[in-house]
Amino acid sequence: MKTFLVTAFILLFITLFVISESYPCTFFYAATKKSVLFGNNKDWISTESYVWFCPPEKGGYGRILFGFEFFPGQKEPSSGVNDQGLVFDLGWTSNKERTGALTGETFKGNIFDKILEECSSVDQVLELLKKYNNLQVQYTYLVIMFGDKHGNSLIVDRGQVRAKTTRFQIVPDDSKAAEPCTQYQIAHSLLSSADEISIDLFKRILASTHVEASRATTAYSTICDLKNGKLYIYYFHNFMEEVVLDINEELTKGYRTLELGSLFPPSVAEKDFRWLKNRELEEKKEKSLAKTKSREAFEHISGTFVNSFDPEDSVVIGFENDKLYITSADKSKVELYPESLTKFFIPLANGDWNLTFAKGESKNSSTLVAEHEFLGMKMRYERIK
């Protein structure tokens, strides 16, 4: 699983996100002659979010990325901004049918990181998307927004591109829905009635559209001042605590990854939410362990499997002290928990991986299908030994 995540995103993330139709992420862009701002609420099932800083190198642009860890040691961006004033964010859509024509080749890697590294404007993003078909092949269940400091933005939804036609754009884009969702209604009302756009206005919109629920919460929020290169960060829907970063200044400090919560004072609400989610994980494990059979019953899944899409991506499944583990090509290792003789899961804070094994002609399982419970990621692995 060198790319349990990268390959997954080759069929997918991150991000980020619609947990269900009840909790869509909210992000929006607005531009006037004076200001160009972007804001987002990242609604998710976990607060274990990260920010990583990638300084410019080899002619590429520097960028700051936000995201989650969907497999131990493997983080994927769900939003980000570069030092040229280009920003992106993504969310889930319930309609996964592709409507755009399929063109171009598939880029093996994270297309969003590549866009921020190579593009400085929405026009350049469009040119790159003509070359690569990732958004049409892998991301049909994502709605993605790109915006630049020049006043241009667009939404890519199931392969279709919608450019900004007024001074702002909003996701979820429910402008044609019979009953627009609450987040859209609030954001649209505040943006359309404002004489000027400002950081205070965007903060007000984020505060009014954030989510607090046992299932999902607003893990983090950001406002990007694209003309002035400033980044405003809020953690766990607390808009009283604000971290302001100068994008160019931060990128001079070198490459680094931080847990987003480390930038903020401790929060009782966040601690309680994290405790609740950890308890849910432990309960899942306990239920699974109650089904555990003898080691011999699971011997048929031991072995090495290679990804059908990417031969460099392989996983090894084996026993240690009578416990089953799956190890990726980069040596990340996690325990497998049984649901039956052929179905297993990996309980993680950012969503479980469900693994299904199928037997071939021999007594051993010949194929493995790994699927993320929320993200729609599905990968097929074939046994090689």
Question: Regions from the language model: what does each represent?
Answer:
Residues E280-K385:
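Peripheral terminal and inter-domain segments
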Residues M1-F9:
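Bacterial N-terminal signal peptides that target proteins for export
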Residues Y23, A30-K75, S79-E117, T140-L142, ...:
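C-terminal, well-structured catalytic/ligand-binding subdomain of enzymes
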Residues Q124-T140:
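Secretory/export targeting leaders with adjacent low-complexity proregions
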Residues G109-L116, V122, L126, S302:
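Extracytoplasmic/secreted envelope proteins and their assembly/folding machinery
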Residues A8-V18:
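Bacterial N-terminal signal peptides
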Residues F28-A31, C224-L226, F319, F357-E361:
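Short, low-complexity Ser/Thr-rich regulatory SLiMs
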Residues L126-L129, K203-L206, S302:
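A generic alpha-helix structural signal
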